[in-house]
Amino acid sequence: MRVIILNGPMGVGKTVTGKFIAEKNPGTAFIDGDWCMDIHPFVGNRETKAMAVDNILHMIGNYQKCSECKMVVLVWLMDDPSVLRSVLDGLAALRAEVKSVTLICDRDTLIRRWKNDRGCEWRTDQWLEISLASLPRFASMKDAIDTSVLSVDQTADMIMGDQSQS
């Protein structure tokens, strides 16, 4: 099974890009890692992140058993390298074919996208500052793609290359 991982700061466009890829490729499941640790109030600590990784891998394992599912797109903010490593190790154990990409954009683009996404409960000024502060860390990742001047479909094409199923 093919698994596409989209990492990056909040507001960069992981969800919209992941959903676009899933919709354009029949037999693709979409997983938002946030669903896998949706505890109220939100707690992002070692224990809840480990639980989320376990939930993600369990879901992917189940999709792998389904003859209708050919690919999974996972979107999740993984700023802790050990979390990403745990996901990648788990996918290796599942013998998945993995492409991991970190989406980034410049500061002005992130602010614009943030302000245009009013439907998300996380789009507060406090979280925007946290997201902006994380840009340099994500930009330093070797798999980073700068989406500042790219549309969603251009970003998806860059991620998928010749792997698109449609």
Regions found by a protein language model. Name each.
Residues 116-158:
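Small-molecule kinase domains that catalyze NTP-dependent phosphoryl transfer to phosphate-bearing small molecules
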Residues 94-114:
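Conserved phosphate-donor/acceptor-positioning beta-strand/loop module used by diverse small-molecule
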Residues 14:
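Conserved lysine of the Walker
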Residues 6:
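Hydrophobic anchor at the beta1->P-loop junction of P-loop NTPases
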